[in-house]
Every structure is written in structure tokens, then in C-alpha cells.
Amino acid sequence: MAGVKALVALSFSGAIGLTFLMLGCALEDYGVYWPLFVLIFHAISPIPHFIAKRATYDSDATSSACRELAYFFTTGIVVSAFGFPVILARVSVIKWGACGLVLAGNAVIFLTIQGFFLVFGRGDDFSWEQW
């Protein structure tokens, strides 16, 4: 039952993050949909972790080169997702208010992704690996 509560909480927080992102695009004062390209960063951010999890077999090791490279790529993706709306606002493609809403949405969505891996990545019987 605890896994179901966690799944509902993660779904709710993901919906809040996407709401911030959509508000940054769809409000009448902003009306520009360029910030939606951060959804690409949200979609590809877990991919390095998936690859590193499949490529490394020793779970006892504290660190491996493959896992560290996955952390590096994931960090680059997350920093790019936060930098993209700032660059768009800096060159006046979007307004700074829209940038703030997109950055708030990014923070909530990436914390939701991290929470998903913390809750469901333990390898127990209610794990995402079974899906």
C-alpha cells in the first residue's frame, strides 16, 4: 500500500510541474510555446541511468566509470533544461515571468523523477524494473 501512495504522490507532483510548464507557455501575457522544448530534456534525463544500470553488474562497488559517466551526462541534461529557458528569456524570445514558471516546473519535474528512482529503484517486489 505504501508503494501505491508513493505512486499517487509522484503523479500529483508531476502534474503540478507540468502545470507550471504549461502556465509559462499558455498564459495570455506570455503566449509563446518555445519553453515546451524542455520536455525533451525531461524525457531523456533518465536514459543514462537506465544504460548504466544495465551495463554495470557489480552492485557492491561504490562507484564505477560507467555509473559516473551516466551521472555526468544526466547532470549535463538537467543543467541544459534549466539553462534553456534562461537563454530564451535573455534573448527576449520569452518573458522573464514565463522563464520563472518554466524553471519552477523544471524543479518540480526533476525532483519527481528523482523521487521515482528513490522510491521504486530499490529492487524490492514493488519496483519499476517489473514494469
Swiss-Prot record:
InterPro entries: Vps55/LEPROT (IPR007262)
Recorded family membership: Belongs to the OB-RGRP/VPS55 family.
Chief subcellular location: Golgi
Organism, as annotated: Bos taurus
Topology relative to the membrane: Multi-pass membrane protein
Transmembrane segment boundaries: 7-27, 32-52, 69-89, 100-120
Name used for this protein in its record: Leptin receptor gene-related protein
Keyword Cytoplasm applies: no
Keyword set includes Transmembrane: yes
Description of how the protein assembles with itself and partners: Interacts with LEPR. Interacts with RAB13.
Key words, A-Z: Endosome, Golgi apparatus, Membrane, Transmembrane, Transmembrane helix
